[in-house]
Amino acid sequence: MATMNTDATDKDISRFKVIFTLVVSGIECITGILGSGFITAIYGAEWARGKTLPTGDCIMLMLSFSRLLLQIWMMLENIFSLLFRIVYNQNTVYILFKVITVFLNHSNLWFAAWLKVFYCLRIANFNHPLFFLMKRKIIVLMPWLLGLSVLVSLSFSFPLSKDVFNVYVNSSIPIPSYNSTEKKYFSETNXVNLVFFYNIGIFIPLIMFILAATLLILSLKRHTLHMGSNATGSRDPSMKAHIGAIKATSYFLILYIFNAVALFLSMSNIFDTYSSWNILCKIIMAAYPXGHSIQLILGNPGLRRAWKRFQSQVPLYLKGQTL
């Protein structure tokens, strides 16, 4: 069995590293929580009023809510791993944090993948019968697909709770020069099981992303050839929709690949627990959901308008509170 082992003591992490990590990742998490919370509040309010949400908005609600949970959970894990190390390094607590983090990451990826597939089916134009069938059925099938995605994410994250992670604290490591003892934190990861369950959980949604992006590019090429040398081509709404969807998909893939690598490296214990590389992984992991939430708001005209209204109302509310 291939395993990765690390150990660390309280002396291995400086106060500067603790403060730096908490501040930087905290700013990223709070930014993401505000962005995801805003999207959740907008669509959640419409749903609470009894309105039937369009399929795209329903996916956005699921994605933003799961991402809100992910960012809150990551913030809690950073606080516990840096400030409450004895509690965090209890085997049950450590495994709980890791399993839920992977589950929320996988769920987020699935929801984002279905969002891209949905917009691909709306925007792209092909004459293939299978494409037409998917285009007609996607609205009916989407609630079932979202529920199935949660079950799949759970099925590939729950096995990580057994025979993958093992941590413990030794409180009796002697320090001869001080005639005292110090706490030492040991962690062990079964790299083979982690690689299998982690990668198989992200493989299918990543393939869906790549297929959606490929179909959009092919559809854009066909549309461009059809338009020919038409002078209004650059202002064509269909072309703008294609380009916008391709850009959004590309940005997400870049963000997610960095996040996936950082999350895997952090969980595999390749780096020492409190090394600068591990801290960098925490910062990258916090940046991904925040960055994508901002991209979703900026790329959606309705959310942009709602955000501008929100910005204009905040000063009025604060002014009223001071009177």
Swiss-Prot record:
<feature type="topological domain" description="Cytoplasmic">
    <location>
        <begin position="122"/>
        <end position="140"/>
    </location>
</feature>
<keyword id="KW-0919">Taste</keyword>
<feature type="transmembrane region" description="Helical; Name=3">
    <location>
        <begin position="101"/>
        <end position="121"/>
    </location>
</feature>
<comment type="function">
    <text>Gustducin-coupled receptor implicated in the perception of bitter compounds in the oral cavity and the gastrointestinal tract. Signals through PLCB2 and the calcium-regulated cation channel TRPM5.</text>
</comment>
<feature type="topological domain" description="Cytoplasmic">
    <location>
        <begin position="298"/>
        <end position="323"/>
    </location>
</feature>
<feature type="topological domain" description="Extracellular">
    <location>
        <begin position="1"/>
        <end position="14"/>
    </location>
</feature>
<dbReference type="GO" id="GO:0005886">
    <property type="term" value="C:plasma membrane"/>
</dbReference>
<keyword id="KW-0297">G-protein coupled receptor</keyword>
<dbReference type="GO" id="GO:0033038">
    <property type="term" value="F:bitter taste receptor activity"/>
</dbReference>
<feature type="topological domain" description="Cytoplasmic">
    <location>
        <begin position="36"/>
        <end position="58"/>
    </location>
</feature>
<comment type="similarity">
    <text>Belongs to the G-protein coupled receptor T2R family.</text>
</comment>
<feature type="topological domain" description="Extracellular">
    <location>
        <begin position="269"/>
        <end position="276"/>
    </location>
</feature>
<keyword id="KW-0716">Sensory transduction</keyword>
<keyword id="KW-0812">Transmembrane</keyword>
<keyword id="KW-0472">Membrane</keyword>
<feature type="topological domain" description="Cytoplasmic">
    <location>
        <begin position="212"/>
        <end position="247"/>
    </location>
</feature>
<feature type="transmembrane region" description="Helical; Name=5">
    <location>
        <begin position="191"/>
        <end position="211"/>
    </location>
</feature>
<dbReference type="GO" id="GO:0004930">
    <property type="term" value="F:G protein-coupled receptor activity"/>
</dbReference>
<feature type="topological domain" description="Extracellular">
    <location>
        <begin position="163"/>
        <end position="190"/>
    </location>
</feature>
<feature type="glycosylation site" description="N-linked (GlcNAc...) asparagine">
    <location>
        <position position="170"/>
    </location>
</feature>
<feature type="transmembrane region" description="Helical; Name=7">
    <location>
        <begin position="277"/>
        <end position="297"/>
    </location>
</feature>
<dbReference type="Pfam" id="PF05296">
    <property type="entry name" value="TAS2R"/>
</dbReference>
<keyword id="KW-0325">Glycoprotein</keyword>
<dbReference type="InterPro" id="IPR007960">
    <property type="entry name" value="TAS2R"/>
</dbReference>
<feature type="glycosylation site" description="N-linked (GlcNAc...) asparagine">
    <location>
        <position position="179"/>
    </location>
</feature>
<keyword id="KW-0807">Transducer</keyword>
<protein>
    <recommendedName>
        <fullName>Taste receptor type 2 member 40</fullName>
    </recommendedName>
</protein>
<keyword id="KW-1133">Transmembrane helix</keyword>
<feature type="transmembrane region" description="Helical; Name=2">
    <location>
        <begin position="59"/>
        <end position="79"/>
    </location>
</feature>
<feature type="transmembrane region" description="Helical; Name=4">
    <location>
        <begin position="141"/>
        <end position="162"/>
    </location>
</feature>
<feature type="transmembrane region" description="Helical; Name=6">
    <location>
        <begin position="248"/>
        <end position="268"/>
    </location>
</feature>
<feature type="topological domain" description="Extracellular">
    <location>
        <begin position="80"/>
        <end position="100"/>
    </location>
</feature>
<keyword id="KW-0675">Receptor</keyword>
<feature type="transmembrane region" description="Helical; Name=1">
    <location>
        <begin position="15"/>
        <end position="35"/>
    </location>
</feature>
